[in-house]
Amino acid sequence: MQEGELAISPISPVAAMPPLGTHVQARCEAQINLLGEGGICKLPGRLRIQPALWSREDVLHWLRWAEQEYSLPCTAEHGFEMNGRALCILTKDDFRHRAPSSGDVLYELLQYIKTQRRALVCGPFFGGIFRLKTPTQHSPVPPEEVTGPSQMDTRRGHLLQPPDPGLTSNFGHLDDPGLARWTPGKEESLNLCHCAELGCRTQGVCSFPAMPQAPIDGRIADCRLLWDYVYQLLLDTRYEPYIKWEDKDAKIFRVVDPNGLARLWGNHKNRVNMTYEKMSRALRHYYKLNIIKKEPGQKLLFRFLKTPGKMVQDKHSHLEPLESQEQDRIEFKDKRPEISP
């Protein structure tokens, strides 16, 4: 490895040949791992946004692109006729069911793309998080060490030098693969020209950090059913002060702030008088449908019983009429005049 290159784990050769059925998957996983820092740039232009924002056409475009890029067997489109939000809900088992020959690879590729999108937001080449000045116990950097021309390329606004070791230690808790590559022992050896080249290649893709972030008002487009709304909030880490996963694999989640969650749901439904009591009545409706259940002996702890893929299928069948009936019944109760005893 030349000095200044980012460390990428090599794929060690193995003496024994894998079973025939694993050749395609092994080759594709190796290609995914070797995408490296430019991986997100390989995607077609429209697909470089967050996967949860993909349209139905984008999902099918991604499917065809993945098949061509990684020589995957052709997958039937009817298994992926959904938007990006629904695609991100699918589990690995759902992918295997819809694409038996390549479901594992497609699932891992989607997770990789989502991870790379997060890395581009707060990665070390875009200045944002690493330029924050926070109190540290490290000695201040002498002025003569920060006046060099390699500190910042003002024409592009990209950081052309690794972050200060003090800042690296302060932000060590962030769970980001892009940050994990920056270790104090390798900061001095990074090739600044390589960093500048990478910043230039990803400049068009990552211009979005300068845009204001969407407000946390609880409004989610095209999301009418309560179970869908709850799941979308769980997928967005900005709403963790209100609701969060306790065990994502087991689909167990906790309502952290009941009143705050009710306000979000009320804002989404344009009902200013929404309370958690009213919202929980609608939530209990899903107990009867075996979609959500309350964890026994636990307060504000719930579990999704059906896989998200199954719920997406049910959304256009019997689930919406039942939801509408339940919502009408709740609204009727809310509108009944109070009678004094």
Swiss-Prot record:
Q: Which UniProt keywords apply?
A: DNA-binding, Nucleus, Repressor, Transcription, Transcription regulation
Question: What Gene Ontology cellular-component terms does the record carry?
Answer: chromatin; nucleoplasm; nucleus
Record InterPro entries: Ets_dom, ETS_fam, Pointed_dom, SAM/pointed_sf, WH-like_DNA-bd_sf, WH_DNA-bd_sf
Q: Where in the cell is it found?
A: Nucleus
What positions does the DNA-binding region cover? 224-305
Q: Where is this region: Disordered?
A: 315-341
Tell me which tissues or organs this protein is expressed in.
Expressed in hematopoietic tissues.
Q: Which PANTHER family match?
A: ETS, TRANSCRIPTION FACTOR ETV7
Q: Which family does it belong to?
A: Belongs to the ETS family.
Q: What does this protein do?
A: Transcriptional repressor; binds to the DNA sequence 5'-CCGGAAGT-3'. Isoform A does not seem to have a repressor activity. Isoform C does not seem to have a repressor activity.
Protein name from the UniProt record: Transcription factor ETV7
Lineage, uppermost ranks: Eukaryota, Metazoa, Chordata, Craniata, Vertebrata
State the encoding gene. Answer: ETV7
